[in-house]
Amino acid sequence: MGRKLHKEDENDMITIDTATEKDILEFSKNIRSMDAKEVEFVSGKPFKDHLGFLLTHVEDVRAIKCDGVLLGIGNWYQEQLDWGLYSPGVVGWMLLTNAVEDHKIEFLRWSKELVKTLLEAYPDITNVVDSRNLLHVQYLDFLGAKFFEDPFRKDLWHFIIERS
């Protein structure tokens, strides 16, 4: 049922589908520490304090899996006003588990394909990133992001990935 993006070898297949409560709970036990720190920095609350919201709104969360292994959760919204952001494109968010390391090449290929698909439908993808989460910054740079420092919060960068 989930959207599948293949590579030549179909053994490693990434899917994205509506998350279940089980996915959210599994994710909460396996979130990468750098992503948990970023959630707390951006929102002011530890990740565990967001669990109730995620479980209540599970239909708005997507689970990212490779051959059934949970790699992360995320979604995109056409517009969102959180953190003062507005975009005619989409505001995208994604948090990952440590399992993504075991599927790194396929995940990066899938990410490029997802960005391409989103940019066919929307003019850009945007959000914020903790500049100290170097792996996240490198990932966004790989996807073609441009970064802009927040004038009021040290270490918070806004990013945008635009259609070319």
Which residues are covered by each model-predicted region?
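Short amphipathic alpha-helix that is part of the acyltransferase structural core
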Residues: 3-45
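Active-site rim helix/loop that mediates acceptor-substrate recognition in acyltransferases
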Residues: 39-60
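Conserved acetyl-CoA binding element of GNAT-fold acetyltransferases
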Residues: 85-101, 157
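Conserved acetyl-CoA-binding loop-helix of GNAT-fold acetyltransferases
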Residues: 103-117, 138, 142
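Conserved beta-strand-loop-alpha-helix junction that forms the acyl-donor binding cleft
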Residues: 121, 125-141, 151-153
